[in-house]
Every structure is written in C-alpha cells, then in structure tokens.
Design a protein with these regions (language model features):
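Right-hand nucleic-acid polymerase module
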Residues: 42, 99-135, 147, 153-154, ...
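Short, low-complexity, polar/charged sequence segments that are solvent-exposed and flexible
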Residues: 32-36, 195-197, 255-259
C-alpha cells in the first residue's frame, strides 16, 4: 500500500476503525456466511456446536474474581510497600486457585451503589432482545470474523477496482487509497452504506478514529496533509507511519515491544530463580529478536 502511494502523483487515503468489532457481530449473519462458505444449507453437528459455544459465551472480570477469592484490590496491591505475589500463581497463592475454589465463588454477587447486583460470571447484554458478538481471542474468532466480513470486503474491493484504488482490512482496521480527484467524503459514505448493508445493525464505524489524509506533491516531495485540519499529518496504519518519504515504526509500537521484552526477561529470571534453573535465552531470542535461528 505504501509503495502504491509513493508511485502516484497524489492520492487520498481514508482509514477507519470499527467500534467494538467482535462484540457487535450479528449471529444470524455469521451463521449464514458460515453455511455459505461450507456450501451447505445448515451447519453440520460439530460446526453447530462450535457456533453455539462462541455465540453463547460468558465472561468474568479478573479483578472481581480476585476480590471474591480474598485478594486485595489492584490499588491496594499497588500501594503496599512489599511486593505482592502473583495472585494467579498456584504455588504461592494464599488460596490455591483450583477448580474447587472457583466453583465456590461462581454464584458470588457484587452489589452496586444503587442496590442492584451482578453475578461474577456474566453474559453479554441483549440489545432489543437479541445477543450479539463472539469472544475475542479464541482460536476460531479471527477466522469467523473474516468469514463474516466477506460480502463487505467484496463490495469494497469492487468499489476500489472501479475507481483505481486499493482496499485493505486487518480485523477492524480498514484503509482505502484512491485518486485525489475523488471525494473522501463520498467514499466514506459508500463504505458506511456497505457496512450497514452487510455488517448488521450494531457494527458501526468509530468516528473518533477516522482519518482523512491527502498525499500531494509539495515542491518535489510527496507530503501528507490532514484533510480536516489542513495541516501536515503522516498516515498511521497497523503500527506504521508513512509521511510520503519514509515508512517508520510508530513510537507506541516500539514502547509496547520493549515493555513486553522487559516483562518476559524479568519473568524468565524469576522463574529460573524460583525453580533453581538456568534462563533459556533461545525462546526470548525467538520471540523478540532477529538473533533466533530462522524457521
């Protein structure tokens, strides 16, 4: 995509983010698309079991769970002078988080200030009597979300082909690039209409994360301008920044990388010390460095 922009004399770029993507997927559309991909009129028994488990899920808040198990809240744990052991580590927990412990708190209630209460284990709230969404992070979630978006993707690809542009989507992050002679607002309206047609009633664009960028040649260099404000603003997409000349990694992406790296090293050292073993650096290299042996 960045190469395509660089080769143009100028273009428009529209990036959008879908609000609460996994939480707002329509179960009826998902089932219909799943059947369509399989080429069947109804899901097989094993497929339907997976579908039902993903559309009738429950969840809990980890802090509420720790409170029910007798642990101090997050702020208290943070403010204590001495280090607090990891509450989820069985070997050092005051209460071992066994299945029996968890079963004992399943019916636990949390009372709100208005006198209402909620159970520890919750289910997604219904909207107009209907449940939406699938859990994020399950082995099937990414695949099913792509199956769900097939018609929307096809519609957007066809639109970009007609006007000589490019469409890309990664999960809930969407970017389209097209000739600068075409109005960005016009394309935005068409994407919004396509989402309404193929995405269901609850899947919406997050207006706070919409970016409209125009790449134009200023003197001899390609420059990115925010269409809304008229000031310089590089394109940001999937952790990268492109200003018309260079593709850079976003600073927040680097910060997150180093934070995870330091956390992994610290955890490996503590684990090795606790079990009186050596630190295995190969796994750290493989996950966070170019020093790992190529697969």
């Amino acid at each position: 995509m960045f190469d395509w922009i660089a080769q143009t004399q100028g273009c428009n770029v529209l990036t959008i983010d879908l609000s609460s993507f996994f939480d707002t997927l329509d179960h009826e559309i998902l089932k219909k698309q799943w059947q369509r991909v399989n080429g069947v009129s109804s899901l097989s028994k094993d497929n339907y079991i997976v579908f039902k488990s993903l559309t009738h899920y429950s969840f809990l808040n980890i802090e509420d769970t720790l409170t029910a198990l007798g642990w101090p809240d997050r702020l208290t744990r943070k403010n204590l002078n001495k280090k607090i052991p990891n509450p989820l580590r069985k070997e050092i927990s005051a209460r071992h988080q066994s299945m029996e412990d968890f079963r004992s708190i399943r019916k636990h209630k949390f009372f709100n200030s208005d006198g209402t209460f909620k159970y520890l284990i919750q289910t997604p709230e219904k909207i107009a009597g209907k449940r939406y969404g699938i859990p994020q992070g399950s082995p099937m979630s990414a695949i099913l979300s792509n199956i769900y978006m097939l018609d929307f993707d096809q519609n957007c690809c066809d639109l970009m082909t007609q006007i000589g542009g490019i469409y890309r989507r990664y999960c809930d992050d969407i970017v389209v690039t097209f000739p600068e002679s075409i109005s960005i607002d016009e394309i935005y309206n068409k994407l919004e209409k396509a989402l309404s047609t193929h995405g269901g009633q609850q899947l919406k664009i997050n207006p706070a994360k919409v970016e409209k960028i125009q790449f134009s040649h200023v003197t001899t260099r390609l420059t990115a301008i925010d269409v809304t404000t008229g000031i310089y603003k590089p394109l940001q997409y999937l952790g990268f920044i492109y200003d018309g000349e260079k593709v850079l990694i976003r600073s927040s992406s680097l910060s997150n990388y180093y934070r995870r790296l330091v956390s992994k090293i610290r955890a490996s050292k503590n684990r090795a010390k606790r079990h009186k073993k050596i630190v295995y650096r190969r796994k750290i290299y493989r996950m966070y460095s170019h020093l790992a042996r190529k697969q």
